[in-house]
Regions:
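Mid-domain alpha/beta scaffold segments of enzyme catalytic cores
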Residues: 1-129, 137, 150-151, 165-166, ...
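Short, acidic/turn-prone active-site loops that include or flank metal/cofactor-
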Residues: 33-36, 190-195, 220
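Short helix-capping segments at alpha-helix termini
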Residues: 61-65, 157-162, 208-210, 238-244
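Active-site/ligand-binding-proximal alpha/beta "capping" segment
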Residues: 88, 94-95, 208-209, 229-241
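Catalytic pocket-lining loop regions of alpha/beta-barrel enzymes
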Residues: 123-206, 215
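Short active-site-adjacent structural elements
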Residues: 195-196, 223-227, 258-259
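Short acidic/histidine-rich active-site segments
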Residues: 210-227
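Mid-to-C-terminal alpha-helical segments outside catalytic/metal-binding sites
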Residues: 230-263
Length: 263
C-alpha cells in the first residue's frame, strides 16, 4: 500500500536504508528537524542541517523515487544562547522554500524555561508564515508526560495558534484521550521507544469515527525500523478495516494536513 511517512529523519539514514523504505511503498515523506542535538553547538551546526534538508535530501528523494518535503525548527537542546538567537533570526528565510511545509519539531520535553521560550517564539513564526507545526512531546513511558502535554496545549492556546494545525506527536495510551479532546491531530509515532504497530492499530480501530484525526509516522532516525508504518497498515488489514479507511490514515491524512502537492 502506498503511504506517506510524515516524520522521517532522513539526514541520519543512508541511501541503502532509504531505498528499502521506498520499496515498502513510501511515496513521500516529511523530514523534520531534530528537537535536540547531541552536544553543545553554535548556529552553524543547525544551519548546515537546514541546508542539507532543503537541498540534498530533496534531490536524493527524487533520485531514489519518493517525494521529500521539509519541516524546520530551532532545537531546544544543544545550542548555545547565541546560537539559538541566531537560528531564530535566520529561520524565516529558510521558510520561503516551497518544500518547507511545516515548523517542527517544536514543543516541550521536560518543560524548561528555554523550551517554553522557544516554543512560543516558533509558534508565532509558524503563524506568521501560515505553516502547521509538528509538536514534540515526551515519550509514552515518561512519568512526566501527562503534565508536559497539558503545558504544551496550554501554550498553544495562549499563543492563539489554531489547534487543528498542530500534530501532538508521540502519543501514548495514558495521554491519548487528552490529545483527542484538544482538537489537534494525534501523532501516532511507531518506533522502539514510542508505540508498537499493534498498539497504534488498536487506537485507530477503537476510534473509527475519528479517522481524520490520526497522523501515523515512523519517527525513524536509526536502526532497522523501516517497516513500521506498513506494519500498522497490515495490522489494520488483518482487523478487516476497509481499504479506504487504512488509505485515509496512512496517506490522505498527512497529505491534507501538510497540503502536499501529490496525486
Amino acid at each position: 500500500m502506498r503511504y506517506i511517512d510524515p516524520h522521517l529523519h532522513t539526514v541520519l539514514l543512508d541511501d541503502g536504508v532509504m531505498m528499502k523504505i521506498a520499496l515498502t511503498g513510501m511515496e513521500a515523506c516529511v523530514i523534520p528537524m531534530f528537537h535536540c542535538l547531541n552536544g553543545i553547538f553554535e548556529a552553524d551546526a543547525v544551519l548546515t542541517l537546514w541546508d542539507r534538508s532543503v537541498d540534498f535530501e530533496l534531490k536524493r528523494g527524487g533520485t531514489i523515487g519518493y517525494e521529500a518535503f521539509v519541516s524546520l525548527s530551532v532545537p531546544f537542546l544543544g545550542l548555545t544562547d547565541k546560537g539559538t538567537d541566531e537560528c531564530l533570526k535566520r529561520l524565516p528565510d529558510y521558510l520561503k522554500n516551497d518544500r518547507v511545509v511545516a515548523l517542527g519539531e517544536i514543543g516541550l520535553d521536560v518543560g524548561t524555561a528555554l523550551e517554553k521560550r522557544l516554543f512560543r517564539a516558533q509558534l508565532q513564526i509558524a503563524k506568521s508564515h501560515n505553516l502547521p507545526v509538528i509538536c514534540h512531546t515526551p515519550i509514552r513511558l515518561a512519568a512526566h508526560g501527562p503534565e508536559i502535554i497539558r503545558q504544551v496545549v496550554s501554550i498553544i492556546k495562549e499563543e492563539k495558534f489554531p489547534m487543528d494545525r498542530v500534530i501532538l506527536d508521540h502519543a501514548g495510551e495514558s495521554t491519548f484521550d487528552f490529545r483527542m479532546a484538544s482538537g489537534a491531530k494525534v501523532g501516532l509515532s511507531t518506533c522502539f521507544d514510542k508505540m508498537p504497530p499493534e498498539s497504534v492499530a488498536n487506537l485507530i480501530l477503537n476510534n473509527r469515527d475519528k479517522l481524520d484525526r490520526f497522523i501515523v509516522n515512523s519517527e525513524l532516525a536509526s536502526g532497522d525500523g523501516y517497516f513500521t508504518v506498513p506494519m500498522v497498515a497490515l495490522a489494520l488489514r488483518r482487523a478487516r478495516l476497509p481499504y479506504e479507511d487504512i488509505y485515509k490514515v496512512v496517506y490522505e491524512n498527512p497529505k491534507a494536513f501538510f497540503k502536499l502537492p501529490l496525486d
